[in-house]
């Protein structure tokens, strides 16, 4: 399959209609969420993948904006025929709350003052970012995400989604991340913040009408960027080579290529990022701790996770180490979560999750190819009780636009199924009760059945729908031939 770009794209904006209550007790009014989408949401709204970005990222994850010289930050894995295939999936990425690329943050106008929030913006957490994303997903009328994917701080958001909204996440892929920020990670973030705060132009955060604290922000970026690389990658990229000179300068000017590279990274960063946003987002990273500062175990924190999870680490990542990823896997395994683990082999360090598109695509494609019934089924499917009338069943089918209704007991135990064909037969024969027409010997699927098994059952019995039940026979949802054809054929409609 030919791999292509999604082409020219535009950033959209969603304005929350209600206040957003924050983790720390404050609230925000008139919150705006900037987001981009790629691909088409199918009619079941079951093919949506939410991509979560890292500290310095934004909603522009793929394609090109008019006049851009570079594509979106994960364009190498998102697009037609790529790993996150936009011919098959509907990809969503939003700028995080507290950001500076279209979503409400400290550089946004405070509706109560008409001026930038600056330090009047409340402290936020990863949980707040995810809460804002959930508002967006609700706005898009998506009841359950096919997957949530993200690296670094994006991986923290993935884990928070699994914890905060377990019923909304079918699969999750946290990459190069951690379940809580370590003292070393907090230390690096604090040095970066001090670099910004120490800049005389920072002015207690009130710099928007004057000169910006670019020197401090550039230094913060330089410090952070070092943690994204590995010693091996720096040797490969720079060694001890001098920058545009044959010998040492014997002064404090730039001598080495690696110095010049860091200066470039810092300077370019100031042209696209807000210093106050850096303060707020890095603090949110520091506060991230699923164990709630050690008051619960990680296993306890992850006990309600329902998603199928793929944890990915990078062998040369010393910012968020493989050991931290394995700790997540162990905690999920203790809760019998369907979790798998893969490690990217790379010399790039933490940034490998952005650069190793080949390995990442191979791993993720393998994970998605093992699609289960739970990954695509309709949850909260319409059901009806045995004592209902034929007329009630017909009205429910029309209202819900379905052709199959599982018949259940008061505790949602599967009793049978009635179809549109059964209703037609009932009208012809003048039946008035469901128990006169419903099928009691029903072919069903389990949520953990491979999708191929469900498809074989439908072909064998010449049926177009299977109720999905748990081990106790309770109805959990419904899977149809439309779900399967959309998944296999990449049918967007």
Swiss-Prot record:
Pathway the protein acts in: Amino-acid biosynthesis; L-methionine biosynthesis via de novo pathway; O-acetyl-L-homoserine from L-homoserine: step 1/1
Main enzyme class: transferase
Transmembrane segments: none
Keywords: Acyltransferase, Amino-acid biosynthesis, CBS domain, Cytoplasm, Methionine biosynthesis, Repeat, Transferase
Catalytic residues, chain numbering: 152, 317, 350
EC number: 2.3.1.31
Any one GO biological process: methionine biosynthetic process
Primary site of residence: cytoplasm
Binding site for substrate: 221, 351
Start and end residues of each AB hydrolase-1 domain: 47-356
UniProt GO molecular function: homoserine O-acetyltransferase activity
One term under GO cellular component: cytoplasm
Annotated SUPFAM superfamilies: alpha/beta-Hydrolases, CBS-domain pair
Reactions mediated catalytically: L-homoserine + acetyl-CoA = O-acetyl-L-homoserine + CoA
InterPro entries the record matches: AB_hydrolase_1 (IPR000073), AB_hydrolase_fold (IPR029058), CBS_dom (IPR000644), CBS_dom_sf (IPR046342), HAT_MetX-like (IPR008220)
Keyword Cytoplasm carried by entry: yes
Subcellular location: Cytoplasm
Span of domain CBS: 377-434, 438-493
Top-rank lineage group of the source organism: Archaea
Family: Belongs to the AB hydrolase superfamily. MetX family.
Subunit organization: Homodimer.
The protein's role, per its UniProt record: Transfers an acetyl group from acetyl-CoA to L-homoserine, forming acetyl-L-homoserine.
PANTHER family assigned to the protein according to its UniProt record, in alphabetical order: HOMOSERINE O-ACETYLTRANSFERASE
Name this polypeptide is given: Homoserine O-acetyltransferase
Gene: metXA
